[in-house]
Amino acid sequence: MIEVDRIVSANAKVDDEYIDRAIRPKLLSDYIGQPQVREQMEIFIQAAKLRQDALDHLLIFGPPGLGKTTLANIVANEMGVNIRTTSGPVLEKAGDLAAMLTNLEPHDVLFIDEIHRLSPAIEEVLYPAMEDYQLDIMIGEGPAARSIKLDLPPFTLIGATTRAGSLTSPLRDRFGIVQRLEFYSVEDLASIVTRSAVCLQLEIDVEAGQEIACRSRGTPRIANRLLRRVRDYADVKNGGKITALIAQEALKMLDVDLAGFDFMDRKLLQAIIERFDGGPVGLDNLAAAIGEERDTIEDVLEPYLIQQGFLQRTPRGRIATSRTYRHFGLEQIEK
């Protein structure tokens, strides 16, 4: 799938992880953006610490790349506890989860990424653990099998997902705190770029940070990835100093335009305008026109274009909006 190689992909890449850990904020005071989430979490964490309780179980959802893992680690740091990290697909057996739960210290955080991908068997183990801090374990097999209950220390489960609607109701209802992360403003992304540059000991102009931020599709992960590639360009072309001009040249080389579109985004929108008179066009015809799979268009290309108002899905097919025509400097066809 093309998403693997796109520099504007919000999904994590292997080379993102090491750098992201180095520049990730550790405390809420360093956390940029999401003001409502930050304000609420400050209150919830302070209240839990005053009562000397574990924080309520927390569900964090939103599009990829917005900082769900970062927020989970911040919660653990603010609470002064350890965090154990795993993901839904990794937990294949009930024993895997039981081993993690029984090794938790009081008030520790268990972070499960992609929690919507937990198997039903794992969810069944989680229910009493979340609600009563108890673990039901089956000992033996066949007629001799019996269930025993183990008491667990109070802990906080933090679940992260890009698909909150895929969670079962019983699991979703057991989270006392639910936070949705929204796309970031250009101003907040510029602040994130500046902070990341300081962490990486880079010399960057304010205007250069803005150039990167406005192309980052509202997503810190993309902003930090673009910053690293612009740094490479600046190291070669300008002795490491990132000016607005250097940032513009680097981003042009990377083929990322002012809207954060890459070649594939533009190919899709231009096909609708040039080959189908702006639409409506069916998904199969569009896939054939640009040489991509239906799933790639629906799951990878379209979400950002729709969210930003460049594309509409209608019962008759896909339509390019007036904003798309303006972006390409074209006059919209009257129908």
From Swiss-Prot:
Record keyword Phosphoprotein present: no
Give the Gene3D superfamilies listed for this entry. 1.10.8.60, P-loop containing nucleotide triphosphate hydrolases, Winged helix-like DNA-binding domain superfamily/Winged helix DNA-binding domain
Describe the protein's quaternary organization and the partners it interacts with.
Answer: Homohexamer. Forms an RuvA(8)-RuvB(12)-Holliday junction (HJ) complex. HJ DNA is sandwiched between 2 RuvA tetramers; dsDNA enters through RuvA and exits via RuvB. An RuvB hexamer assembles on each DNA strand where it exits the tetramer. Each RuvB hexamer is contacted by two RuvA subunits (via domain III) on 2 adjacent RuvB subunits; this complex drives branch migration. In the full resolvosome a probable DNA-RuvA(4)-RuvB(12)-RuvC(2) complex forms which resolves the HJ.
Q: Where is this region: Small ATPAse domain (RuvB-S)?
A: 185-255
EC number(s) per UniProt? 3.6.4.-
InterPro entries membership: AAA+_ATPase, AAA_lid_4, DNA_helicase_Holl-junc_RuvB, P-loop_NTPase, RuvB-like_N, RuvB_C, WH-like_DNA-bd_sf, WH_DNA-bd_sf
Query: Which species is the source of this protein?
Result: Histophilus somni (strain 2336) (Haemophilus somnus)
According to its UniProt record, which protein family does this protein belong to?
A: Belongs to the RuvB family.
Provide the protein name.
Holliday junction branch migration complex subunit RuvB
Enzyme class comes to hydrolase
Annotated region described as Large ATPase domain (RuvB-L), given as residue ranges: 4-184
SUPFAM superfamilies, per this entry? P-loop containing nucleoside triphosphate hydrolases (SSF52540), Winged helix' DNA-binding domain (SSF46785)
Q: Name one GO biological process term.
A: DNA repair
Report the protein's function. Answer: The RuvA-RuvB-RuvC complex processes Holliday junction (HJ) DNA during genetic recombination and DNA repair, while the RuvA-RuvB complex plays an important role in the rescue of blocked DNA replication forks via replication fork reversal (RFR). RuvA specifically binds to HJ cruciform DNA, conferring on it an open structure. The RuvB hexamer acts as an ATP-dependent pump, pulling dsDNA into and through the RuvAB complex. RuvB forms 2 homohexamers on either side of HJ DNA bound by 1 or 2 RuvA tetramers; 4 subunits per hexamer contact DNA at a time.
The protein's location, in the record's own words, is:
Cytoplasm
Residues reported to bind Mg(2+) = T69
Kindly state one GO CC term assigned in the UniProt record.
Answer: cytoplasm
Task: Copy the domain comment.
Answer: Has 3 domains, the large (RuvB-L) and small ATPase (RuvB-S) domains and the C-terminal head (RuvB-H) domain. The head domain binds DNA, while the ATPase domains jointly bind ATP, ADP or are empty depending on the state of the subunit in the translocation cycle. During a single DNA translocation step the structure of each domain remains the same, but their relative positions change.
N-terminal signal peptide = none
Where are the coiled-coil regions? none
Gene Ontology molecular function: ATP binding; ATP hydrolysis activity; four-way junction DNA binding; four-way junction helicase activity
